[in-house]
Structures are given as structure tokens and as C-alpha cells.
Amino acid sequence: KYLKNFESIGVKVLLSKAPDFAGRANLNYQILSTMKGLEEGEKLGCEYAIKTRTDQRFYSTNLSRDLFNLLKIYPPSPNYNMHSRLIALSFNSFKYRYYGISDMFLFGNTQDMLKYWNSPLDTKKYEEYKTIKQKDLWQQYCSETYIASHFLKNIGVTPEFTLKHTWKIYKDLFIFIDKEILDMYWPKYTNLDSRWRLFRPNMLEEMRHSDWLNLYLNDDFFIKEDIELLIPNIGEN
């Protein structure tokens, strides 16, 4: 009934077969459903696409204009085979996580989006993850890093899993925008607007637009080696 209501207002609803194995944090569900939506958009001739969550809302009345204007201002680096940059959200894009681009929102050329989300399904069983140190889980095996690192492989870039390379990729291929630009609303877990902000260096500090702009404008802005100490040294065994 509800799906037909959506279709009656011109929304195309796609149904996907559930994966045989969900993957860590239901990663395989996200990969399959996102790829199916992007592939359908490509068939329909959609040149650009937005990936969002159904439990989040964006109230900005200038959303599409703002996103397209950003792509006009910041062309992609010529060193990569990309139609345009990908616009990522500061929210849940943690500054000190390797390739930690939030998987909640992404906007860009549909061909580039297909490259970004075309990851192999996660086949690691939960028992295998138990043997991985917590630090490595946070830096290399979370959903965001898994997807982004496979995207790099899809465009011929070998992930180095360092902060310096992570920030170079951000500088060259992405634009990070603050969630306030989208007027984002997401009441899950908490209704606080700034759930991660502590206003001091910390592991949950997000990659905000001002941080990205500093990266974009200044090659020497890359972090010093000693900032690696911020990476948590927990779960050692």
C-alpha cells in the first residue's frame, strides 16, 4: 500500500533481494541497494545522483543549486579519471579515520558514483573480526573505509592507509560540506545538532568544510607525523 502511494507521486521504488550474508554492520545490504538504485538511475539517463538514508531529511530549499555550484567552482584533479568531484557530508566523516567518508550522503556524477559504490560484498565472518585489533577495525574495516578504499582501487589508486594519503584523496577528489548547508535532520540516537563536536582535537572530530578548504588551498596543511598519536591505541592483545 505505502509503496503504491510513493509510485502515485512519481517515485520509482526498487525492491532488492536480500544478500545471503549481511556483512559487518549490514554493509552488503547497503552496497546492493545503492548499486541497484544507481544502475536504475543510469538507465533512466540521470547524469547526477544523490545517495541518502531514508531516515534522514534535508530541508534546504537550495540544495540542488548549492551542490551544482560547488562542482562548478571545484573541478576534479586531472590526475584521476573522474567526471567531477564527489560531494561528501561532514557528518560522520571523521577527520582522523583513514578514508572515512560518511556513507550517509554522497552526491556526484552517476558514473563516478557507480565507481564509488561498486565494492565486493563483505565475506568476513563475525568470528574473523574478533581477531582484529580494535584500532585496525576502526581504521581499516569500518563500512566507510571499506567502501572508499575499494573506490580508490576502482579508479586505479592503491590505498596507503595513512592520514597523509587520506587527506590527499580528500583534497583531489572530494568536496566536504557541513550538514548545516543541507539543513539536515536526523533524530536517531539523539536530537543534538552537534553530537560529535567537543571543540578540541579528538578522534571523533569531523572533516568540516573549513578543514577541507584548508587542504584544498594549501599542500603544506597535511598533518604532522605526531598527530598519528591521536589514533586510538586500544584493543591491543
Task: Report each predicted region and the residues it spans.
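ER/Golgi luminal nucleotide-sugar-dependent glycosyltransferases, focusing on the catalytic module
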Residues: K1-T52, Q56-N237
